[in-house]
Design a protein with these regions (language model features):
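N-terminal export leaders
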Residues: 1-2
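Immediate post-signal peptide segment of exported/extracytoplasmic ligand-binding proteins
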Residues: 16-36, 136-144, 324-336
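Extracytoplasmic small-molecule ligand-binding "clamshell" domains
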Residues: 19-95
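Bilobed "Venus flytrap"/periplasmic-binding protein-like clamshell domains
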Residues: 29, 33-57, 69, 115-188
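An extracytoplasmic/periplasmic, membrane-proximal ligand-sensing/linker region
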Residues: 29-30, 40-41, 47, 51, ...
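Periplasmic-binding protein-like
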Residues: 33-38, 111-121, 213-248, 266-283
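Short helices/loops that flank or line small-molecule/ion binding pockets
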Residues: 73-87, 100, 118, 183-198
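Pocket-lining segment of extracytoplasmic ligand-binding domains
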Residues: 139-146, 150-250
């Protein structure tokens, strides 16, 4: 874990310390540990969020530190160990954390009509043996795949559910080889000839174009998905409602004012690919991701080999029951607001 305090003007505190319980049982918040999704390297991912964390620290009157890790798996484990107080997560990771009752959604990126939509993509080299989507789907065993972690919506879940499984292709087993990494790492793998095709998304590929123009010029998009569920901002569920409301107010108001400070905040948001800032949200924002996971589960069950039809039907019934429970829990959050 790489922790970085972005405000040294606050009262002394211990990096990574667990919040102490108050007399009423709720944690006493002495710092905010912000979980950072791995975009490229840990230092790069952390640096992108540092300006917003510094402003958050001033607004909340608390030190804010970045918990930056190299993989989705490590970030997931940190959430499970209560080492993270808030985070910007993939919809898949957020759904898992919310259903485990560890986190709750407080905000998500604002979208407006006419702005470019965030989509999953597949990348291949412009000059190379693989040129088309048809060639990929016809003989997946010929090609080396670079993909995201299974917790990544655009790096795994969406390509699997919208493209590969409908064509009877399991990403994990049908390709000649596979490399799992960040969106930056998968794009570099194809650009440098270490893989033939990579999962990615429009937002991170645009960032890749700016950071690696030479390598990006070697790549082409051969498939684009429908818009996937958005990534939300989550906070620990056991934190006091007053703190959650203050944090949500900061996020929703960030970059919305006038003057030099608001102008600077809007520049920060542009770097984070959130040009229009954040809007208030609750756990019901994860309903699209729950539906996507449900569809993926059904696709896998229907395409798998079973000892008999009854076994398949039992699996499908369990998937239906789990999805119904998720929907009920996520809708309950919206109703209680």
């Amino acid at each position: 874990m790489l922790a970085l305090a972005v405000s040294s003007l606050m009262a002394p505190w211990t990096a990574g310390a667990q919040p102490a319980p108050s007399a009423k049982g709720a944690p006493v918040i002495k710092e905010v540990r912000f979980g950072v999704l791995p975009l490229g390297g840990t230092v790069e991912s952390r640096a992108l969020w540092t300006p917003l964390m510094a402003d958050m620290s001033r607004a909340l009157g608390l030190p804010v530190s970045a918990y930056s890790v190299p993989s989705y798996e490590e970030l997931d484990r940190a959430i499970g160990r209560d080492e993270i107080d808030m985070a910007f997560l993939s919809a898949k990771m957020a759904l898992d954390a919310v259903m485990q009752r560890r986190m709750k959604v407080v905000a998500q990126i604002a979208r407006r009509d006419g702005m470019p939509e965030h989509r999953a993509v597949l990348l291949a080299r412009k000059v190379g043996p693989l040129h088309t989507l048809e060639g990929l789907l016809a003989q997946p065993e010929r090609w080396r795949l670079a993909r995201g972690d299974s917790r990544s919506v655009t790096g795994f879940v969406v390509p699997q559910s919208q493209l590969f499984l409908p064509n009877q292709i399991e990403m994990e087993t049908r390709f000649r080889s596979e490399f799992v990494g960040t969106h930056q790492a998968t794009a570099l793998a194809v650009a440098n000839g270490d893989a033939d095709v990579a999962t990615n998304n429009t937002t991170d590929f645009e960032r890749f174009r700016q950071q690696f123009p030479v390598e990006a010029a070697r790549l082409q998009v051969i498939w684009e998905s429908e818009p996937p569920p958005g990534a939300p901002m989550v906070v620990r569920r056991d934190y006091p409602p007053e703190f959650q409301a203050k944090l949500q107010g900061f996020l929703v108001g960030y970059g919305k004012g006038k003057g030099t400070r608001a102008d600077a905040e809007r520049e920060v948001l542009k770097d984070l690919r959130a040009a229009y800032g954040y809007v208030a949200a609750d756990d019901s924002a994860l309903l699209p991701e729950a539906k996507l996971e449900y569809q993926l589960g059904r696709q896998r069950a229907l395409s798998a080999a079973w000892v008999n039809d009854a076994a398949r039907e039992q699996r499908l019934q369990r998937i239906e029951k789990a999805y119904a429970a998720q929907v009920e829990a996520l809708k309950a959050s919206s109703a209680s607001r």
